[in-house]
Amino acid sequence: MAQRRIANPALFICDLQEKFRPAIYEFPKVVSTAQKLLKASKLLNIPVFATTQNKGRLRLYEPTPEVKQALDSLNASGPLSCIIVGIESHICVTQTTLDLLRAGHQVYVIADGVSSCNKEEVPIALARLRHEGAVVTTSESFMYEYVGDASTPEFKDIIKVVKETSQSTKEAMQTLCKI
């Protein structure tokens, strides 16, 4: 089997709370992308962490002892490849990404899986995060890069996810990934 280019992955879902639905630009499309990545994460055995903003400071949340133990266990295998989706692009997504980059991790910000109250904030935040060293990519691109090629056992499962979500992916891309 080919060696994966993305090692030690973990999916981070940032501040994706129902109470923000009315305020966030195209919230349902962010949720749809997060659901697709949750399904792929289950198929690919990628651990998932949900984060919320720490009200005292705009940083990655303070993990519970159980979550800290899980993260420490993952870190023992080397730096994480962190996949980020959620809201808001210029606040929680940015601060979480910067914290993870500073800790030495590789970060993949999923452009069709992030948004903000003001849609104009999104491309500015993504440009900044790219400049800081994050990989800004799409959910489909990430999934294909992770599985590598058709020889991997999970490839057919990911193809199925891609086909099942093709319409919602198209809509998210057309709305959230405008240049």
Which functions belong to the PLM regions below?
Residues 1-65, 69-76, 98, 106, ...:
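Active-site acidic carboxylates
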Residues 5, 118, 138-139:
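Helix N-cap and loop-to-helix transition residues
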Residues 17, 88, 140:
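Short, flexible active-site-adjacent loop segments at beta-strand->alpha-helix junctions, enriched
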Residues 51, 110-112, 139:
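Generic beta-sheet signal
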Residues 55, 114-115, 143:
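Conserved beta-strand edge residues that scaffold enzyme active sites
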Residues 81-86, 90-133:
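A contiguous pocket-lining binding segment that forms or flanks enzyme active sites
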Residues 139-146:
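Acidic carboxylate-rich catalytic motifs and surrounding loops in phosphoryl-/glycosyl-chemistry enzymes
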